[in-house]
């Protein structure tokens, strides 16, 4: 009697279409080579002005309050007066309970309201809580939602559990952009970063993002390289173009052109 072969899950089948067996040392060498050869050409005032306009200006502190978030938002309102030669930031990013404060205070057009949600930064709570928090953030005025993958589920090989959460949260977001944070510092290997990138895009991410900024290492050149490669390959295979957002570890103005260089090399849409 023949034994039935185990059925491959649709998530394993999705991963099988890509090379996810990457070597950490090779990726590190490739990232270093790209930085040495191409970053100097992108380290220009024009590029830095473009990158500034991609920033999500963020306050995610335990001591945030209505008053502090109002003052934070006023900085964006006054930006054009103080820096007339620069375009404003892309978004203000806050905890979901401050979405309405930003909405009521923000006076400038073309600056979005982004909220972290779904148990940020650990993603360790019930899916019902994640969905409710996300829905409430949108109801209070959020234009974009940032969530974190269930890293524990991913590392345990529970791709179905991780992906179904992302899919349910994207269904809640509907037409609103949803950025999916991989928390690359917790994934340890570039192979895991590649797999998490593909699974997140497969599950409906509009952008994939390196990290919460709460854990180190964060937006490393190696993580940026692998994520941008994954985005390019996913686009070539599906026709769906997903954006990229580096976060955490970008500590000064000269760090940003590194991520921009990987973006340009892989024709990727950027959010900072």
Language model features by range: what are they?
Residues 2-51:
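Charged, compositionally biased N-terminal leader segments and the immediate start
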Residues 53-55, 90-94, 113-116, 145-147, ...:
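Hydrophobic faces of well-ordered beta-strands that scaffold small-molecule active sites
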Residues 56, 102, 137, 180, ...:
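Conserved, mostly hydrophobic/aromatic
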Residues 57-65, 116-129, 155, 181-192:
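Active-site mouth loops of central-metabolism enzymes
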Residues 60-63, 82-93, 147-161, 212-219:
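Glycine-rich, proline-tolerant flexible connector loops at the mouths of alpha/beta enzymes
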Residues 87-140:
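Active-site cofactor/substrate anionic-group-binding motifs, chiefly glycine-
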Residues 96-110, 125, 152-169, 189-192, ...:
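Active-site-adjacent beta->alpha loops and helix N-cap segments on the catalytic face
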Residues 261-268:
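Conserved small/polar residues in nucleotide/adenosyl-binding loops
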